[in-house]
Amino acid sequence: MGRDEHIVEHPRGKGVERVDEAYAIRRYQQAAALLPLRWQRLCRQVPEEQQAEAEELRLRAGQTLTLLLRGGEVPAARERPYPVVTQTELEQLCDGVTDYSRYAAADTLSRGYLTARGGFRIGVCGTAVLRDGVNTNLRDISSVTIRI
């Protein structure tokens, strides 16, 4: 395996495949572009080695943005005090991904995820909105995870 290649699990569980570093960085940058502006800026400051290795971007209300790397979870920010994600930013992220039409995405959102441009799967946690005992939507978003 060359220095610019990484072995990653196939997204559909079909073994492993080699992904070149440039592609992995591009996917990271595309995922980061889904974030509110201040988090996009922070993600651009992450070293390319970590960008290439990142598997997820994790945002939790009241905590800092973290990256899931092969070795574990690390803060995206390099210096303390780490900036904190707000619930409003999580709501903005979901609104942006759904083109401000969460109602149109209510089917998948009620199951806890969204699919963004580029095929990114976004896990969403919040308070279930029930109608006749059936989960129809989410509100009060508390965390979002973007799978790269």
Where do the protein language model's features map onto the residues?
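N-terminal anchoring/assembly modules that precede and organize ATP-driven motor systems
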Residues: 7, 13-78
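Signal for well-folded cores of large energy- and translation-related assemblies
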Residues: 44-47, 95-98, 102, 129
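Generic structural hydrophobic/aromatic packing signal, biased to beta-strands
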Residues: 57-59, 65-67, 93, 97, ...
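Short amphipathic beta-strand/extended segments with alternating polar/hydrophobic composition
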Residues: 72-84, 123-125
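A charged amphipathic helix-loop-strand protein-protein interaction module that recurs
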Residues: 81-109
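P-loop NTP-binding catalytic core
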Residues: 102-148
